[in-house]
């Protein structure tokens, strides 16, 4: 049996927030358009490639203030991170349709992983295209987020996508992920709590409880996008990042690059999943996991340098 994932418990608070979205460009149309503007949505191939949205360059304060409800020591100190070069992030977590394209193209067969109730990931078969099977009524439509891959498999997908498109894809660093989640906001969330319900974000994210309408994962894009045009940043599934886990931000990169170590026992993950309380969904909330861990609550999204 795999060791228990390194999961902690947090709390949350409010803020304000908008929306956004723009045009969908194919790679050829984009080439004619020149440098894409922030908010531009594109795909590097018509089929099987994730939809990407261009984020603005700029700076933000990474981490959380001492008085933020639910704050943990690893969320500080607050520090400035600056992005000087444009990049894009996938609008949604990688979906089963996109993951299946990788599985089918490479012939990879995902092995069994976590078999504990609520985290079931059993090996797929050839007739299933290598996709794992799940317990209960777990949804596996093409628009649900792909789950159950470990860190190495997520990295393999990124390498495959880069080779397929000829474009530089990568996993997001923690700072990229937080920048995209905050979308210009500075509080715990880029949206307000549900009216009259403290610590409830059912109108904005899929977390613990039936109020949001989902007992397991929701199809990607089921909740509103943030001001950068990115979806599902505060619930549904946790997501792998490119960073090794660090106890705080002392010595953290200030340019948005991944913070890695030669010997990395725990890998940083971000977001929150369908089975955890909203307090874990705060933009600055951090978590970590063994790199070889699997679960029906862990997936990933990708970043593309422009």
Each language-model region and where it sits:
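A short glycine-rich, aromatic-capped structural motif
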Residues: 43-122, 149-152, 235, 242
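Short, structured beta-strand segments at or near domain termini in extracellular proteins/domains
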Residues: 296-306
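N-terminal low-complexity, Pro/Thr/Ser-rich intrinsically disordered segments
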Residues: 34-44
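Boundary at the C-terminal end of the N-terminal hydrophobic targeting segment
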Residues: 29-33
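Bacterial N-terminal signal peptides
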Residues: 16-27
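N-terminal secretory signal peptides that target proteins for export/translocation
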Residues: 1-10
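Functional-site microenvironments in short loops/helix caps that host divalent-cation chemistry
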Residues: 61, 65-71, 109, 114-115, ...
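Surface-exposed intrinsically disordered loops and tails
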Residues: 120, 125-132
